[in-house]
Amino acid sequence: MTITLGQLAQHLGAELHGDADVIIQRIANLETAQAGEIGFLSDSKYQQYLATTQASAVLLRAADLAMCQTNALVVKDPYIAFARVAQLLDSTPAPAVNIHPSAVIADDVQLGQGVAVGANAVIETGVVLGDGAIIGAGCFVGKNSKLGARSKLWANVTIYHNVRIGDDCLVQSGTVIGADGFGYANERGEWIKIPQLGGVVIGNRVEIGSNTCIDRGAIDDTRIADNVIIDNLCQIAHNVEIGYGTAIAGAATFAGSTKIGKYCIIGGASVFNGHIEICDQVTVTGMAMVMRSITEPGLYSSGIPAQTNKEWRKTAARTLHIDDMYKRLSNIEKLLDKQEQK
């Protein structure tokens, strides 16, 4: 796709400085951009490239305009503007076009207008596909599941039975939604499987990365609210509830029946205990282990930041003696108290 800088300015509501007729074809970094590309400056540490960039135009703040040597669009937030332009110029191919003859689709499947199904996909009985839904090659959609309008499944996504996915969702390859939750009872050392009878309900505008697993509920449904974004390799166990607008980075793990509030940010490789509740607007940094409910918004962390190996080994060795040091300090305090009383 090509667009003029003037059209981009109108699309973004930006202030144009320069040639409105210059053609923009792609978006690029300031350092490597060439003619026909638009760069962006959202971090002041890259200001030096404003003087040397070969970009045809730059997205920037008003404070940086004087340093720019090429056409510019002045915006309030260059990074948000970059995201909008990237959407406009997106050249990602669709997961599927039309319905491939090798796709296996049950006779009673309800196909909306403009549905596309890729090669070797399997759509089972009772499924409803909304208008413009796209099913990539090799996908499986189980009985009585529903995929909303304009939602996309990339290749080899597995959707089990009785899963509901809303409108404008995106699921990347390898993800499994609706597999059995990890539910077992133990009778004198023998594990008794508990059939997982709930489903999964995913809202609108939800994006899920590759190789993420969202398990079905044991009795009630596992629920993902609208506008949630989930990275790759995450594990969401049965009956978990993720609140509106929450962002979850890669490899985060949520044990069963945990509830995450609205507008939370979950760092990569974080681990959440089961049956706890996290209130709205909580940020948990990467590698944190959350064992108890959080009732106050804010920033939460655990774990040891990276050190040199030598420093880390010293720290680890000293932690083994914390209990002994505590006892010694307590004894010293008692001795000091006795001396003060004399």
Swiss-Prot record:
Pathway terms, separated by semicolons: Bacterial outer membrane biogenesis; LPS lipid A biosynthesis
InterPro entries with a match to the protein in the record: Hexapep, LpxD, Trimer_LpxA-like_sf, UDP_GlcNAc_AcTrfase_non-rep
Annotated GO biological process: lipid A biosynthetic process
UniProtKB keywords: Acyltransferase, Lipid A biosynthesis, Lipid biosynthesis, Lipid metabolism, Repeat, Transferase
Group of enzyme by EC: transferase
MF annotations from Gene Ontology: N-acyltransferase activity
Quaternary organization: Homotrimer.
Function comment: Catalyzes the N-acylation of UDP-3-O-acylglucosamine using 3-hydroxyacyl-ACP as the acyl donor. Is involved in the biosynthesis of lipid A, a phosphorylated glycolipid that anchors the lipopolysaccharide to the outer membrane of the cell.
Similarity field: Belongs to the transferase hexapeptide repeat family. LpxD subfamily.
Name this polypeptide is given: UDP-3-O-acylglucosamine N-acyltransferase
Gene that this sequence comes from: lpxD
